[in-house]
Design a protein with these regions (language model features):
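Flexible "arm" and connector segments at domain edges
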Residues: 1-45, 49-74
C-alpha cells in the first residue's frame, strides 16, 4: 500500500471526512445533472461512486451488502 495514496489519506482522516466527501460529490452530481455536459456529469458520477465505495469499506460493508438489501425489497 502506498502510504501517500489518496485512499489511505481518506481512511486516515476517518469516517466523518469520508462521509463529507460523499456529500460533496453528491451535490456536484446534482449540479451537473441539471446541465448538458455529459463528460462533467459522468466524471462527477464516477467521483461519487468512488467515494461511496470508500465509505462502504470504512463502515465494514461491500457493494454486495447493498445489492442484498435491494434484492430483499422486491
Amino acid at each position: 500500500e502506498d502510504k501517500n495514496s489518496y485512499v489511505v489519506s481518506l481512511f486516515d482522516k476517518g469516517i466523518n471526512k469520508i462521509a463529507q466527501k460523499v456529500g460533496e460529490e453528491a451535490v456536484e452530481v446534482v449540479i451537473e445533472a441539471k446541465d448538458d455536459d455529459e463528460n462533467l456529469f459522468l466524471n462527477e458520477s464516477a467521483d461519487l461512486l468512488f467515494h461511496y465505495l470508500i465509505l462502504l469499506r470504512a463502515k465494514g460493508y461491500e457493494l454486495k451488502d447493498i445489492a442484498k438489501v435491494l434484492e430483499e425489497r422486491h
